[in-house]
């Protein structure tokens, strides 16, 4: 997962914050639109996955994500991204590793309908990261 560091202010009063930027698991995902033969696809639960067998050698997939959430694994010769720890969720885990490991509880996972998410977005002052991309992401910051 990419983590963006933001610095505000000037010495001696500097504020540093960090913004996690995982795969946004978009409804209108450019990576799905631009991939061929369902190399990148969305599961019924909304998790966007790259098929490792179909993606082998397909470096162009890296550039399809406007958020920069897909990277090239040189060793495996394939694009990779956050899988939302789908393999663990399928084994009964309640949350992905990043949420479990976050020492400040800054990361949360919520399974909610769109109307519920809008309410949560307002009450917690959440925002869509880079709304100009118009990808309908399911990750809010």
Regions found by a protein language model. Give the residues of each.
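Non-ligating segments of multi-cofactor redox enzymes
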Residues: 1-141
């Amino acid at each position: 997962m990419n983590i963006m560091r933001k610095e505000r202010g000037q010495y001696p009063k500097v504020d540093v914050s960090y913004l996690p930027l995982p795969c946004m698991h978009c409804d209108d995902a450019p990576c799905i639109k631009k991939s061929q033969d369902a190399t990148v696809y969305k599961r019924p639960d909304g998790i966007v996955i790259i098929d490792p067998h179909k993606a082998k050698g397909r470096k162009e997939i890296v550039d399809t994500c406007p958020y920069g959430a897909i990277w090239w694994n040189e060793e495996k010769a394939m694009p990779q991204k956050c899988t939302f720890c789908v393999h663990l969720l399928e084994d009964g885990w309640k949350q992905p590793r990043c949420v479990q490991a976050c020492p400040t509880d800054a990361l949360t996972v919520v399974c909610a309908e769109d109307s519920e998410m809008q309410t949560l977005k307002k009450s917690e002052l959440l925002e869509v990261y880079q709304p100009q991309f118009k990808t309908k992401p399911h990750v809010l910051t």
